[in-house]
Amino acid sequence: MGDICETVEATFHGVAYLLTVSTIEGETLCVEVEQKSDCSRWRGDFTSRYIEDITAKTGNFKKFPVFVKMLLSALKQASDSVFVDLLTYQDLEVLKSRKAGGQAPPPRTQPPNNKRYLIMTYAAEFDRVHYPLPLLFEENPDPQHLKRIISQLRSEVEGLQVEAGNRRGGEVSAELRRLREENAALQRQLKQMERSGSGVGAGAESSEARELARELRTVRKERDLLQARVEAAEAELERERGLHRRELRRRAKEQQELVDELGRCKEQIRELKMRIRQLTEDLEARDRRMNSTDRIRSVYARGSNDGSTSGVAPRRPSSGGRGPSSNYMAPTRGADSRSNSRGRGTSSAERSRPNSAPIGGPRPRFDPTEYVRQRKERESAAVGGRRSNAPTPPRSAGTSRASSVVGSRPASAERLPPIRTASPTNSRPSSTERYRPGSGGPPGRTSAGGSRGAADRAGARGPDPYAPRSRGASPSGRATAWGEPGASGGGAGGWSKFPGGGGGGVGGSGQRISSNSPRSMSPARALAEVKQKLSTFVAGRGGSLQGDDASSAHGEHMSQSSKSQVFEDATAEIADIDSRLHALQNFLRMAKTSSTSTSTTQA
């Protein structure tokens, strides 16, 4: 076996190396590894006996020539069954620990000489054998080896220079070579003409020579011009390349900014969607609460309307002095029955929900102009009637206070009477509104007394039951202002703001509706209450006036005046409630429309 020297460039674990394998006298294997980045070198010399011993220890014996051929084949990657790897001492310890059972190797100090291990692996059909070759680090390389490297590098430089010259010569221009060939052809042609044209005169030869020289100069000028154009084109191309690179960098920067802005926009869209979802959930919860509140109010209203009935009580004579409770005359039993039956019929017809359409047809809308005209007519008629009547006796304190504000438009909280809810069978009114059968009226009232004419006059000019109450008035004043009769004076069959509640009569159960109940808070229920009480009041007043023969003419005139005032206040109240209902409906419609448009826009 002759001496071998092979140099191969290989990469191990991302680092480039130069591997040199050589044999000395066929008995010694020399392996040199050089790192290309910092020229670090590792070297190892192995005798044939050493190689055969390590192959025998692995269990797969190989002779020295066979081992060298296997190593060269692995370096050149000529065979798939043999390959090499370059490992450090730490890498070798990690491999040993993996084979031992996956435990981490104990910490050790770094081994001296900074060794490297060239591992040649032979993969058989059912076996894999590793042959390690330790390489020592060379701190002081051999001078002979350095000289050999220098000479090798010089030869490589010369080869590269020759190759660059050939490339540069090829880039000079094919046009220059063509011109040179053409010049040589012209020179040969000139020589031929000189030899063949012996008979031609010297003048002709000189003229042809001058012409050829002129053509030669023209060709050279064209050559120089073409070279200048080529150089200018190359400079322009380089400039365009620079502009293109700058444009690419600018476009890449803009693209990155747009990507960042797109991410921010997506984040904002996600936050807005979450906000829309939250607002939608809040709106749905609010709608559910409103629907549940409406259902509760309707249930309370139906229960209250079903449980409220008109009371029937016999008429009792008054047993005391005249007081605030004698504002109304007590009608007869028949008149009271007729008024209660009419009140029940009216309330049952208007007990349905305000939102539902009437049976007879659509309800006419409120006309403010017509309302003002009718009110003026009623006021003028009432003023004329009062002037023609005889003077009336003085009024009580509660009656004067209640009637002083008739004709003015009270606030919405003061136009409706207080509504209280209680059980139809077991009602417990407050101390100022409690009735005791067989005795006087509520606390603070005086017993109704006096002659029938005084009662007639008090009932004829009694206060409007729907006039606003004064906060500072006494309980008796409030009861008189709202038209509550006394227990002994007119509480038996007189008109009351409660359909089923006479003061101390037979059917006076004293039902009242609490002002804090859901029924009183609903505008539609308040409207129904107003209509029912108006009908009951008109029926009761009409029956009482027909039953009294002594004060028929005077009571009729005052009843018309009181009716006009009641209808005026009730109409104003209805208009106010109607405007509030329309405002509430518009608000709900706008809220739903804005929510729907926002959801559609975001989607």
Swiss-Prot record:
Effect of R277E: Does not restore flagella formation in VFL3 mutant strains and does not affect localization at the cilium basal body
Positions with biased composition (Polar residues): 397-406, 511-520
Alphabetically ordered keywords of this record: Cell projection, Cilium, Coiled coil, Cytoplasm, Cytoskeleton, Flagellum
CDD domains noted in UniProt: HD_CCDC61_N
GO terms for MF: microtubule binding
Result for mutant: R275E: Does not restore flagella formation in VFL3 mutant strains and does not affect localization at the cilium basal body
Annotated spans, Disordered: 288-526, 539-564
Low complexity bias locations: 337-348
Residue stretches of biased makeup (Gly residues): 486-510
Keyword Coiled coil recorded: yes
Coiled coil: 169-289
Biased composition (Basic and acidic residues): 288-297, 364-380
One GO process term, biological-process aspect: cilium assembly
Subcellular localization: Cytoplasm, Cytoskeleton, Flagellum basal body
Record's keyword annotation contains tRNA processing: no
One of the record's GO cellular component terms: motile cilium
Entry's family note: Belongs to the CCDC61 family.
Biological role stated in the UniProt entry: Required for normal flagella and striated fiber formation.
Name recorded for this polypeptide: Variable flagella 3
Organism: Chlamydomonas reinhardtii
